[in-house]
Amino acid sequence: MRLRSTDSPLILIVAAALATSALALSNGAIGQGDAALAAVRRLDQASRTSNGELAPLSAEEHMRRAAIYFANRAFAEARAHWQALITRYPNDERVPAALFGIGRSFYQERRYAEALPFFEKLGRDYPNSREGRDGFYFVAPTLLRLGRAAEAASRYQAYIARFPAGERIADAYLNTIDTLREAGKPQEALDWIERTRQKFAGTPTATNALFAHLRLEISRGNWTKAVTLSDELLRSPLTGTMTSVAEVNYLRAYSLERLGNSAEAARIYQLIPDSIYSYYGWLATMRLMRLGQRAQAIARASRVRDQIRTSADFGETPYREIVLRVAKERGLDPRLILAIMRQESAFRPQARSRAAARGLMQLTIDIAQKYGPRANLSEVGEMDLYRPEISIQIAAAYLAELTKLFPQLPEAVVASYNGGEDNVARWLERSGKRDPGIFTAEIGFAETKDYVFKVMNYYRAYCTLYTAELLPQRPDEAQGASLPEKNASSIP
């Protein structure tokens, strides 16, 4: 459920940066699963000194154990080994990697104020190492998450000036644009859009900068300019970028709607194919209905409803009784829980991701320990997350909290479950809180964006096939033509 290593280059590609750091590569391929975690815990417990400190180990062994702990999100235990290495081997070549590990572990725990000094030290003391450059870079997203957007933008710009051939140079340009938007400096953001397009002309980075310009104008309600930019994007190759033809057409049609050109908007909406796996096609069908194009909307929805009913993918409702019970307790839609479960684990209770997410709902141990007490589970360990009832109970507690944060917008709830509610709050603010499709366009992580598309499509399918009690829908009651009413009500 947490952000993984395939994130987009658009704003805070944290996990990708961490996956490619020297720390992750310092010991080659090593086992980092549940068995490895249990083994290093036994070793540490058996060899601690009388005052409880870690036993003296080689620098390599400290790094090996820290990597295993970190891969399992046992952050405090990982930090103990990194700090031991720094203290015992201050001149070792692995010190920068250990410092970066400590910083990133605090970062992943959202302890940004504690992460910041480690990133600053890396950039200051080790600028010629990969960890030093990454540390310098990560000062920016850390400042952003501390609510210091203007300083964050300046730091991205400092990275560009100091490391013009740095590993994250394209990311720094793109992140500067969106961070300036968050700092309330749209004109400066426009200047950086032009710089980015010139420097990276003919590349996906330049196209992503153009897409950032489109999103900026939509957030400002500059609909005429948004239409012009949409047309320009549609003439550009979109492969390898953060957008698609369907998304750009949706944004173009939405902008035309806001300009009062309903006929042309309807024509563009009809160009977006609707299918069982087309999120923007689904939204386009809804917009057509609202524009009075009832016959076209019903025909599109009927085709998709037939696809869903003949698909073999949604014929069962696994763990129905548990899902219904916790959904009722938390005021959640059980069909959304099933949609998330399907995407997270394909209903496999023993599933485990590379990011140490476990079980049916792919919970990480830090989230489980935070929300376990709210599910009346006072002590939760890693292996408990493979138990279906525990996984569903804790996930429901978390989803209930997210639903309170983002009422009437399941896309934001789903995005939070994958990419973090702090990120979603920023994306929602940038979007202007207008429309689900506008919000989704602002999602800054490629994985999270794709995750939202998939989960919402599954949600549509389950709403078509099942009632809120997970009983089979009668054909005349199926609601595959639109989002559930609670979400549709948020669309102007």
Regions found by a protein language model. Give the residues of each.
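Short loop-to-helix capping motifs
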Residues: Q408-L409, G420
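Short, flexible loop segments at boundaries between secondary-structure elements
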Residues: T448-V452
